[in-house]
Regions:
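Structured, active/binding-site neighborhoods that engage oxygen-rich ligands
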Residues: 1-207
Length: 207
C-alpha cells in the first residue's frame, strides 16, 4: 500500500521525468521539426544525447530544466518555513538562492537551501527571462514590475499543495480541514513573486 510520502515523492519524480522528456523540444516550436528529429509520433522517450546542451559530460543522462529546479527550491522554501504565514517569504528566499545559482552572484549569509549543493541544481538550464528579471530586482532591493502571463509561476508550485497535506495543524492550515483557500492563496502568492499579471499567478491557485 502506498503511503502519503510515497505519493508525494511520486508526484515530484513524475514531474521531473515529464520535464526531462519535454526539455529537448522546449524551444522547437514546430511539430514538424520535432517529427524530423524524433519520428512521426514526436518525442516519446527520454533523449539522453543532449545534443542541445554544451554539457557534454552529462551525455547518457536525461536532464531536467529550470522547471524542476524551481519546483525543488519551492519545496525547500516550504520546508524552511516555520509557519504558514512565513511560507511566502521563505519561498521567495529560496527563489533568490536559485537565482544565485543561475547568475553566479554572491551574497553572504544566504544559505538556507541545502539542495543548491546538488550539481544539477547549480547548472543553468534555460532559466526564464521573467523569473531572472523579477528576482534580480528583488535581489537588488527593487520592486519588481512586469505584466507576464507566462507559465513560469504555475510550473513550480505543486510542492505547496503536496506539503500542506502533511504539515501539522498548529504549523500550517491542513487541506483535510477544508481550508483549501489558504493553500490556493499561497500558491498564487508564490507565482506572483515573479509573474505579476493575473493570468500569471491565478492558474497556480487553481492548479
Amino acid at each position: 500500500m502506498y503511503t502519503l510520502q510515497d505519493r508525494i515523492r511520486g508526484s515530484l519524480i513524475g514531474g521531473a521525468i515529464g520535464d526531462a522528456l519535454g526539455y529537448p523540444v522546449e524551444f522547437i516550436y514546430s511539430f514538424g521539426e520535432i517529427q524530423k528529429r524524433y519520428g512521426e509520433r514526436g518525442i516519446t522517450r527520454l533523449d539522453t544525447r543532449q545534443h542541445w546542451l554544451d554539457e557534454t559530460e552529462q551525455v547518457g543522462k536525461a536532464v531536467v530544466s529550470d522547471d524542476t529546479q524551481m519546483t525543488l527550491f519551492t519545496a525547500c522554501g516550504m520546508l524552511n518555513a516555520g509557519t504558514f504565514e512565513d511560507a511566502k517569504y521563505s519561498i521567495c528566499e529560496a527563489y533568490l538562492e536559485w537565482f544565485l545559482t543561475q547568475t553566479q552572484k554572491k551574497k553572504k549569509n544566504f544559505n538556507q537551501c541545502w539542495i543548491k549543493k546538488v550539481p544539477e541544481l547549480n547548472e543553468r538550464r534555460a532559466p526564464g527571462h521573467t523569473c531572472l528579471s523579477a528576482l534580480n530586482d528583488i535581489f537588488n532591493g527593487r520592486e519588481s514590475f512586469n505584466n507576464s502571463k507566462g507559465c513560469g509561476g504555475i510550473m513550480r508550485t505543486a510542492p505547496i499543495a503536496l506539503y500542506s497535506a502533511v504539515w501539522s495543524d498548529d504549523a500550517m492550515t491542513n487541506c483535510r480541514n477544508n481550508n483549501v483557500k489558504d493553500v490556493m492563496k499561497l500558491s498564487a502568492e508564490a507565482a506572483d513573486i515573479t509573474h505579476h499579471h493575473v493570468l500569471g499567478w491565478l492558474p497556480s491557485a487553481l492548479e
